[in-house]
A protein has these predicted regions:
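Hot-dog-fold acyl-thioester-processing enzymes
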Residues: 2-90
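HotDog/MaoC-like acyl-thioester-processing domains
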Residues: 1-12, 97-152
């Protein structure tokens, strides 16, 4: 893993990176349902979900969104930022759920930094355009702009 300064991150604008695959198991979906209180049958009841057009249980859209940090951490070519005291999620733009993620399927993130700004001395903000792909599917599960702030 390469280590770069926060300022050097600006030189990576437009450079695409791809994460490793992550399995979205039924257990993960069930735990997310418990954490959020969203127990709709399409997520947690395999027998009833078989009767839907999906044919199986599917991940919550917000579960898919919440995988962004895990996928970022599992991106082999992502640089490690030197001198960062902390990083925080600032928000998101243009979040769209384009296809359901079937239980026990695998997803990965394809991302690139599209904007980088110094907000004030020691505080930086960057926007990452991210697509979450489903293994074996031509249609992505989700697209989003993910905004992160880092401090040194």
């Amino acid at each position: 893993m390469t280590t770069i300064t926060i300022q050097e991150l600006a030189t990576r604008i437009g450079s695409e990176q791809v994460s490793d695959w992550v399995e979205v198991s039924q257990e993960m979906i069930d735990k997310f349902a418990d954490a959020t209180g969203d127990h709709q049958f399409i997520h947690v009841n395999p027998e009833m979900a078989k009767l839907t057009p999906f044919g199986t249980t599917i991940a919550h859209g917000f579960l898919t969104l919440s995988l962004l940090p895990q996928l970022a951490a599992k991106t082999p070519d992502a640089p490690r930022l030197d001198g960062v005291k902390m990083g925080v999620n600032y928000g998101g733009n243009k979040v769209r759920f384009l296809a359901p993620v079937p239980s026990n399927s695998r997803v990965r993130g394809r991302s690139k930094i599209v904007q980088f700004d110094e907000k004030r001395p020691g505080q930086y903000q960057y926007t990452t355009e991210t697509t979450i792909e489903i293994e074996g599917s031509d249609k992505p599960a989700m697209i989003a702009e993910w905004i992160t702030q880092v401090f040194n």
